[in-house]
Each structure stands twice: as structure tokens, then as C-alpha cells.
Amino acid sequence: MKGLLKAACVVAALVAAQPASADTICEWIDFAQRLATASAGASATDSALTPAPRNAELSRAQTRVALAMFEALNAIDRRYQSYLDFPRGDLNASQDAAAVTAAYQVLLHFYPAQRAALEENYNIAMEAVSDPARRETGRLIGEAAARAAISAGGIDPAIAQTPYRPRTTPGEWVATALPVYQPYTTAFRPWILPRADSVRPGPPPALTSERWARDYEEVRRLGGRDSTARTPHQTLMARYRITPDMMPSLRYAADASGRAPVENARMFALMGMVLDDTSMATGEAKLHYNFWRPVTAIRNGEADNNQATQADPAWEPLIATPNHPEYPCAHCSTAGAVAEVMTAEVGARPAHGVRVSSRSIPSAAVQVLPSWDDWVREVNLSRTLGGVHYRFSNEAGEQIGRQVARMALHNVMRPLPATQQRRAR
């Protein structure tokens, strides 16, 4: 996503009849993503190279939008455990008014500069709710849900935020660009995890090991800019997956016949919370191990004391190396997390396939894969084909994401027993 679409173009699609439609949820999520992209000022292709926003709370704004909509809808159409211990609301309240108000209030809190556009389009959406009493009751529920979501998942003041310091020999030059990870990266209160380091993987293989030599050679051979071992399709996939777009699959899931709005809001909220914690855990591990990227290792291959590795002082990766430590792979942890959540939502091999697009290739077509595990394997391999990750790092990252997602699915926002549910009419 490059830049912010005019708010009217985005939010006009939010007008829906009661009860709230899948499009209401999807479009507000999409709108939140566009606001975040515009606020960060980064294009889709350079997000791994551009520092994160200085306002730490913005990094979790999208999750709070989804969480607020979930709590507002779940208060009316009670099907799940509340994450925020949010009380039940009026069964006759407008679900549209509740969901739209919840999203609007969260976005207004985090993006006050967009107040005029947000207010204008919020009013348009609310006008579609014809019953004044139901609209007002829904509005009040949405406002309360937004306040609850805004207050959750913030920075923990008890955690020290220590700026990154390059490790080097005194007097020796190192690159001066600091990693994209800000000091607040590991200072959030986790949504799911006990602590940021609770799923930290073991260390990368010893530089003198056979595993190191094998994975080093694989990325050297396949991931070089001028590699002759990589096929044209593999080159395309390495670039295609720099910034994957999962919205095609999420929309297919949301549009499935018989799904209630609260189910879709829960899907987006759970996904956001899992990805936030996965990102935090992956960042914590990266900063802990501070492991070198292939471009550094391969150019200095003689320094690892492994006779099975060959140095190539002129080696360059196919794609730009992200500006943070290598181990574990963040793309792979995200892929593992998404696969676990979506398998729970639509099955391991959804009838419509796993549909993904790309924001790193202009006008990218939607790719359809048979299963979520196929998609994870493709993402993992793409990072080696791009010359930025080793296979062992891909595997470690995937396991982080899967662990976080499984913890979430087993512990939060679970379906209520039928006797405790109160479904909206």
C-alpha cells in the first residue's frame, strides 16, 4: 500500500445494513492499515529498511481497532470469551453502530490529524443505521469498547527501553545505520505471552558445525544476486514475498456463508494480537543473538574457522538485506503464526485455496496455494532465495509464530459453551 487513499473512497464501502456485514469489519481493518502505512511514510518495499514509528503505540493501533470491534460486537452477539472482561450490552443494539464507532474512536485516538476525514465518513456510516434508539445504544457500546481497547496492550513502564548499541572492537568502524527495531520493541505488555523471551529459540548452530556450513552454502549458492542455481520463478517468488498481502485469504474467510460479524472481528483481533506478540518475540531473539546476515558472513567466510565454507568478498544478495540481526527469520515467524490462526479458522486446506498477493511487486496477481503449510514453506524458502536468511533461521522463526498462535488459540477469546452464549437476533 503506497500512501493513504482518500478517506471517502475507503469508508464509503462501510455503509451496510444491520446486522454488521463482513465488509464493515474488513473495510475498517483495511482503512486502519492504510492510515498506518501513510503515518509511517514507508512504501511497501522498504518497510524492512525504514525505522519504525517513533510513537510506539502506533505499532499496535491496528490490533486495537480489531479488538475494539470484537469486544463491541461480542457484547451484543455473545459467542466468545471477552479478552478485556467487557460486559454484555443491549441485545437490541445496532451491531453496525457498535462496530463502526469502536473502530472510529480508536483511529481518532491514534490519528488525530485525520479527524476531519474520520468524522465525515463516520457520520456517513452511522446515517445508514435507521433506528435512532438502536444506533445510540450501539454507539455507546462502541465507545466503551474503544476505551477498553486503547488502554490495553501498551508499553510496560517497568521494562527498561535500552537503545541498540553495535558490538565492535574499540576503534573499529561499523555501519552507522541503527536497526529498525526501536528500544520499545520488547517493552510492550504481551497480548498472549508471559514475556517477550518466553518462546526464544535456542542459539543458531556453531560456526564450526556441519549445519552451519550446509546452510551457509545453500544461501551462498541460491541467494546471490547473480546466482545461476536459482530459477526465474524462484527469483520472482523471492521478490514477491518481500511484503506479502494476506487480505485476499482473510476476505474469503470473512465472506464465507453463515459467518457472523463477531466471528470476523474475532479473527482479525486474534490475528493482530498473535502477530504483535510474534513480532515482539522475534525481535527480542534477534537482538539477543545479534547474528550476522549472509552478506556479512559470506564476504568474511574465512573468519568462521570452518573449512567447509568458502568466502566470496564480492557476494551480494538478490534482495536488500533488512536492517536488523538475522536470527530468527521474522517473515517466517509471521508465516507460521498466520498459518496456525487461519488453519483454525478455515482448515489446513481451504476449499478456495490459500490466496496471497504482494505489495512488493506492482500490480501483483493473487497466487493460490493448496494449503497453509505450503505457504509457510514458500515463505521460508523465499528468504533463502533472496539471500537474507539461512534455513535454520527460517525453521526457528516458523516455530516462534506457531507457538504464539497455539497459545492464543488455546487460551484467549475461546468460544463459549452453548449454554453461556447469547446470540443476537
Predicted regions and their residues:
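Bacterial N-terminal signal peptides that target proteins for export
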Residues: 1-8
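N-terminal signal peptide c-region/cleavage motif recognized by signal peptidases
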Residues: 17-19
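Acidic/polar surface patches and capping/hinge elements
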Residues: 23-425
